[in-house]
């Protein structure tokens, strides 16, 4: 019986060209710097602290050059808690606390941040116009050494602003953490296997009209990009009624319903595209004149 399924190697479709100087280089010459994000403990952040965290992110984003992309990726994977009771510095109460939560299911939250420098043309292309299906020419802007240097300097400034806030800490990821080694998986391998485990074995990818699978995991993808689908009112945080009382508030992030409150394995990707504000202002003014 002849196999009618189309198959291709991952290498032929891979959008990444190389990882050099701890930066990810795409086949379109986009440059990406990756960070591991450490967030505050759940239910420990107040409303004022959420405002301060939001202000720090907004301040950091403003130092990035035009035509940059900020990509925040949050993993929520169901696991059973494994206590660490072999440590010598644990007290009797601490050891009892660890045993109390032994093998209890929970969502393990892992967060990454990716800062990408692209070009005006690349930032406005559609998802079906990629290096996977078309030939490409390296943009002249991305061949300019000063452009790359300024972007890397802005990334360092971005990192300092976030870390100086005192609430969130980001740590630059090195080449081995991105690509992995013989004994440990990098973020690329983890993403392609939909796992945070230290396994270097990739899963089969199945792309069909009815479903998409990675190994034994079936995927369901949702996109939220239309303003009509967004809430009428947004804020940095919200009141979590289940743990709040008349005298005290328990606050969660405004995006918690698609984050920690969504009780299944899932990944949340958030993208912020930084355009040229001066060019956009001229475009809006022209549209306003045409309307009158």
Question: What is each PLM-predicted segment?
Answer:
Residues 1-292:
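Extended, folded cores of ATP/NTP-driven motor/assembly subunits in large transport
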């Amino acid at each position: 019986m002849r196999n009618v399924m189309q198959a291709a190697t991952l290498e032929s479709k891979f959008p990444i060209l190389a990882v050099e100087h701890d930066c990810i280089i795409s086949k379109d010459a986009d440059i990406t710097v990756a960070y591991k994000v450490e967030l505050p403990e759940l239910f420990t952040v107040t409303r004022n602290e959420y405002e301060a965290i939001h202000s720090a992110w907004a301040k950091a984003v403003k130092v990035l050059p035009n035509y940059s992309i900020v990509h925040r990726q949050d993993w929520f994977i169901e696991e059973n808690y494994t206590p660490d009771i072999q440590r010598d510095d644990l007290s009797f109460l601490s050891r009892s606390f660890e045993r109390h939560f032994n093998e209890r299911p929970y969502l393990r939250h892992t967060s990454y941040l990716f800062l990408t420098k692209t070009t005006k043309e690349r930032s406005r292309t559609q998802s079906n116009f990629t290096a996977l299906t078309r030939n490409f020419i390296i943009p002249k802007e991305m061949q300019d050494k000063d452009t790359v240097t300024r972007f890397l300097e802005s990334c360092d400034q971005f990192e300092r602003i976030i870390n100086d806030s005192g609430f969130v800490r980001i740590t630059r990821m090195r080449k081995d953490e991105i690509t992995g080694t013989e004994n440990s998986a990098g973020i690329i391998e983890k993403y392609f296997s939909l796992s945070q485990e230290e396994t270097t074995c990739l899963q089969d990818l199945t792309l069909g009209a009815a479903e998409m699978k990675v190994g034994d995991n079936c995927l369901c993808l949702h996109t939220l990009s239309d303003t009509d689908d967004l809430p009428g009112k947004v804020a940095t945080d919200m009141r979590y009624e289940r743990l709040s009382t008349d005298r005290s508030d328990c606050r969660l992030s405004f995006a918690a319903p698609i984050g920690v409150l969504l009780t299944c394995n899932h990944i949340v990707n958030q993208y912020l595209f930084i355009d040229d504000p001066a060019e956009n202002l001229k475009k809006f003014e022209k549209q306003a004149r045409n309307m009158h």
